[in-house]
């Protein structure tokens, strides 16, 4: 499975997380940040499920569908920041309101923009590395990708693996 649409999944995750941050902008609770992160993850996952569905149901080419969906996600974002999410005090620039501090990741080094997202990214790389190189599921992903006939003969569930790969990439 080739997922060329990771940018679209990232964009839809940002839209879902950003929408949550804007919706909860007046809330002063430590639960806002986890809600924003969770909705961001769900946004990317749901966007990744669309090409998975099209691939498994209609045998659509996942390269084309995921790539085209990246453009759709970009257009949705453009619509939102030029329309309903535009900051009325933003001097007509296409941007949303500033998120509250409760919706922002903590800064790691004062005077920089380095935040906790760096740690999340490094942890994600480690988890995906372990998943792909040290687990049965990672082996199944490789076999389905490199030798679909062998995967079928071994009894690997191709449909399940396509769905999982697109969901994880979201």
Question: Where do the language-model regions lie?
Answer:
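Membrane-interfacial loop-to-helix junctions in multi-pass transporters
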Residues: 25-33, 113-119, 158
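Juxtamembrane membrane-interface segments at transmembrane alpha-helix termini
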Residues: 19-27, 51, 74-83
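Single transmembrane alpha-helix segments in multi-pass membrane proteins
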Residues: 1-24, 37, 41, 45-63
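Residue-level recognition of pore/gate-forming positions within transmembrane alpha-helices
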Residues: 14-18, 44, 70-74, 125, ...
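Hydrophobic alpha-helical transmembrane bundles of multi-pass membrane proteins
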Residues: 21-22, 115, 146
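Membrane-helix/interface signature in polytopic inner-membrane proteins
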Residues: 127-166
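Transmembrane helix-bundle core of multi-pass membrane transporters
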Residues: 62, 66-134, 161
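Hydrophobic alpha-helical transmembrane segments
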Residues: 8-12, 34-42, 64, 115-122, ...
């Amino acid at each position: 499975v080739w997922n060329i649409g990771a940018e679209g999944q990232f964009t839809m995750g940002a839209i879902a997380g950003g929408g949550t941050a804007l919706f909860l902008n007046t809330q002063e609770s430590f639960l806002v940040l986890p809600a924003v992160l969770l909705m961001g993850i769900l946004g990317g996952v749901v966007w990744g499920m669309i090409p998975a569905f099209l691939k498994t149901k209609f045998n659509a080419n996942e390269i084309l569908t995921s790539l085209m969906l990246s453009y759709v996600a970009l257009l949705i974002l453009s619509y939102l920041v030029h329309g309903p999410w535009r900051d009325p005090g933003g001097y007509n620039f296409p941007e949303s309101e500033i998120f509250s501090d409760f919706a922002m990741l903590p800064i790691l080094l004062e005077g920089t923009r380095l935040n906790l997202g760096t740690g999340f990214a490094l942890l994600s790389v480690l988890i995906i590395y372990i998943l792909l190189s040290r687990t049965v599921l990672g082996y199944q992903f490789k076999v389905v990708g490199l030798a679909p006939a062998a995967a079928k003969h071994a009894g690997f569930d191709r449909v399940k693996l396509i769905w999982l790969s697109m969901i994880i990439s979201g």
